[in-house]
A protein has these predicted regions:
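Active-site-proximal, Lys/Arg-enriched surface segment
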Residues: 2-89, 101
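Flexible, glycine-rich phosphate/dinucleotide-binding loops
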Residues: 50, 92, 167
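Short, glycine/charged-enriched secondary-structure capping and boundary segments
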Residues: 56-59, 148-152, 173-175
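Short, structured patches in soluble enzyme cores that scaffold and shape functional sites
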Residues: 85-87, 99-101, 139, 160-164, ...
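Domain-level cores of phosphate- or acyl-group-handling catalytic modules
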Residues: 107-169
């Protein structure tokens, strides 16, 4: 198998993947799993592939690892960004792949991954121009320029993890709205019977330009010592949150 794969060009394999995905989508057997009955969920996920003790090429990423004796060593590695389409809870397949490259000395690893994501989204839009998509990812992608790319350039929706370190003014604005009882609250959600909150168009309070609807989920659980822990999640989305879709949005975002 490896022998034949080595003989094929990446473009050839990419075209084969595209035909397989389009065939599955046209079959309509996964339509019921679309978000809000419309959007295909596409998850961005970075994965490390190859590690080297010496620099392999100009595009190598670099990290430091502390050894057992306390010494630090440099490791060079290649990382790939995958866009995976969720067809069902059991079926998640690759939609596109892009290498994360070290473009310049002064560019951070986060910027390298964001730039790779932008290249990857462009490829996906070209391959599937009319596919209704909701892009999902961690807090790295919760940047206004990336949201604008998804919503305004490609006309897609998005759900990203929200962290204070990524969108501090947004987080503060949401907390201010929540303290003023401006958020909607629903209890008994999901398997844990937790509590959900949401507020739409928080960007109007935060002074942002991109659509930022915030929703969160909280539930209680016990650790191995039977001590109660509170687990919290918070997300940001371009999709309008309602009482009817909050649980589906939480299950999707998790």
């Amino acid at each position: 198998m490896n022998y034949y794969l080595e003989k094929l060009s990446p473009d050839c394999l990419s075209e084969l993947r595209k035909k397989m995905v389009k065939s599955l989508i046209k079959g309509k057997q996964f339509n019921r799993n679309r978000l809000l009955g419309k959007y295909w969920r596409v998850i961005l996920d970075g994965t490390g592939l190859f590690y080297f003790k010496e620099k392999h090429c100009d595009n190598c990423l670099c990290t430091e690892k502390q050894m057992a004796d306390g010494k630090k060593i440099k490791l060079y590695y290649h990382k790939v960004l995958e866009a995976k389409i969720v067809l069902s809870d059991q079926v998640v397949i690759s939609l596109g792949t892009e290498f994360i490259e070290n473009e310049k000395e002064n560019v951070t690893k986060q910027d390298c991954e964001l730039n790779a994501a932008k290249r990857l989204l462009k490829k996906i839009k070209k391959a599937y121009p009319r596919l209704p998509i909701c892009i999902q990812g961690d807090a790295l992608y919760a940047a206004e320029n990336f949201m604008n790319l998804c919503k305004e350039t490609y006309h897609w929706e998005y759900i990203f993890t929200q962290k204070e370190t990524r969108q501090k003014s947004l987080d503060e604005s949401y907390e201010w709205i929540k303290k003023g009882e401006g958020t909607e609250k629903i209890t008994g959600l999901c398997q844990e019977k937790g509590t959900g909150w949401y507020a739409n168009h928080v960007e109007e309070v935060a002074g942002k330009t991109e659509v930022m609807n915030v929703f969160e989920y909280q539930y209680k659980t016990k650790d191995k010592h039977e001590k109660i822990q509170i687990i919290r999640f918070r997300w940001i989305s371009s999709l309008e949150i309602t009482k009817r879709n909050l649980e589906e949005m939480i299950l999707t975002a998790r």
